Amino acid sequence: MSTLAQVTLYFACQAADLSTQMVRDSEGHFAEDLDNCFRRGVSVYEELEQKLPCLAMPSVPCKPMFFSRLQSMMGFTGVYFPFTGEANVNVDAPACLVPATIAHEMSHQRMVFSELEANFVGIAAAVSCGDPVFQYSGWLMGLIQLCNALYAVSPDLWYQIAAASFTPELSTDWEDNNAYWRALESPVEEAAAQTFDTFLKSNGQDLCIQSYGACVDLLVTWFGDEAGAF
């Protein structure tokens, strides 16, 4: 099994184990209190800062984003304003990924401006913190990144991993996320993506929006040993 597949399986198993611990509504959908997540988000980097001291900075709480639905229509889950240091998170997006998005946006507050690095750092912070809700959200966000990469090269292996590891709870969150974004696909989202792509290029991020996918290389490198010993 390739390292990519090993790390994907590792993330799937971690997410599956935590999926049954999350608060859910009567239909099984993720129902953790997001207000509490925003309050607890200020401590999410404490563990990762021990391994990466360069990230040790005072935390500023993220805020729920006004007009979140509009941001979803443009394909955005969060916005960081570098001039004020304020990070805003889309709360109309699937709730199961909001905690990991909080961690992602807080990485920008720590001078991680590249989207490639911010995606990785946010996931690493979330899964290493002591909060099960942030951990689950981080494993899930990383799993989505890894599965997209694995499916592109080996769909059969991806299906084998999903069949072997996904719990009903994890499957529900996975489908909720896919259905939400599928329903919002439109020319508006495509135009916004092109505009953001141009913005990233102008700020020296040569991989542009594709840099989100390049996060997989960092995940495989960082978690490869753990996955190999799993």
What residues fall within each predicted segment?
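Short helix/loop segments within enzyme catalytic domains
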Residues: 123-158
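Solvent-exposed, acidic/flexible segments
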Residues: 91-99, 111-115, 133-136, 188
